[in-house]
Amino acid sequence: NDIAMESVTIPMVKDSEDERYCEIEANKAMLALILNGGGPAHINMYTNYSKDFSVSEIPPVHAIYRHTAFDKEWPKIPKDGKVVVRIGSHANFTEELTDAIDAFCATYDAVVCCDHTSGYRGKYEVQGQLVFCQKQWSSPLSTANLCIHIGEVSGDQFTINTNHSWRVSPDGALRDTFGNLRRVFMMPEVTFFRHYSQENASHREYFESLNEEIKKLEAKIPDLPFSNIWMAQQMVGKLPDHSELHFGIYHSLRSWNFFKLPVGIQAKCNVGGFGID
C-alpha cells in the first residue's frame, strides 16, 4: 500500500503472545493516523467465521499513547508506587544525560536498574540482579509501579517487576520489552528527564534500601564452584582502573551482571548478536 503511513498485519490469535503482538500492531496503525502530520493507515486483519455468539464480554485491550516534546500537556508521574528507570544497552552517556537522570531519581525516589551494557554510572545505579533472581523468596523492593525504559536490547535476564512502562526514545517506535507498554515519548532522553525533574530534590530512600538488601544477599553467597560466576566474583575487584571490559554473550554477560563493576570501569557487549546462534 503506497499511500498508507503505516501498514500492519494482524494474524489469528492462538495464545497470549499473539494477543500481545496484535495489540502492539493495532496501536501502531492507529498512532500513525496522527504522526508527522497524519495520514491513512492500513490494517490487514486475518479473520475466521464462527456461529458461536455466546461471548458477552471481550478482554480489555490497552491503548498506547505517543507524546512529543511539543505537547502542551504531559502525563503526570503516578504517585502510587515505586518508580524505576530501566536502561538496556546504551550508547556512551554524556554528563548532561547522567545529571538529568540523577535529578529525576532524586525527585521521585527512583533507582536506575542497570546491567553491564547500560553504560550509566550515576548516583542511582543499582545492580540488583541478585535480589531480582530469587525464586524461593520475593523482596517487596523487587516490584515497582512504573518503569521508564531507555536503551535497546538488554542482556539482563533478571529485572524488577513493574505494572506498566513508559518508553523514551527519539524514534518514537513501539517497543514493548516488558509486555506492559502504555506510553511512548518521542524525544531525546535528556528532554524527558529534565521536564519531570525538580530542583533541590534529594530522595534516596529506595536506592539505599535496595542496596542494603543487595549487600545482605552478597554476604550470604556460599563458596561457588569453579564457573563463570566464580570467575566474575574473584576478578571484579581486581580490574585495573579506567579499563573497558568487553563481554561475550550470553553466559559471560549474565554471570558478570551479578556483580557491580568498580566506579570508572565501563563495559560493552555485542548484544546485537542475540538470536543468531
Segments and roles (model prediction):
Residues E6-V13, Q127-K135, R182-S197:
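Short acidic-hydrophobic, aromatic-tinged amphipathic segments that line or gate anion-handling sites
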Residues V8-P60, S138-S165:
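Structural signature of the thiamine diphosphate
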Residues M30-G37, E73-V83, F104, M235-D241:
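Glycine-rich phosphate/diphosphate-binding loops that line cofactor/substrate pockets in enzymes
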Residues M45-K51, S89-A91, T117-S118, G172, ...:
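Glycine-rich beta-alpha junction loops
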Residues T68-I77, E95-T98, S138, D223-K238, ...:
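A short, well-structured juxtamembrane/interface segment
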Residues I87-W166, P262-D277:
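Glycine-rich, anion-gripping cofactor-binding loops and their flanking helix/strand elements
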Residues T162-L253:
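Phosphate/pyrophosphate-binding active-site segments
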Residues H246-Q266:
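Acidic-glycine-rich active-site phosphate/pyrophosphate-binding loop
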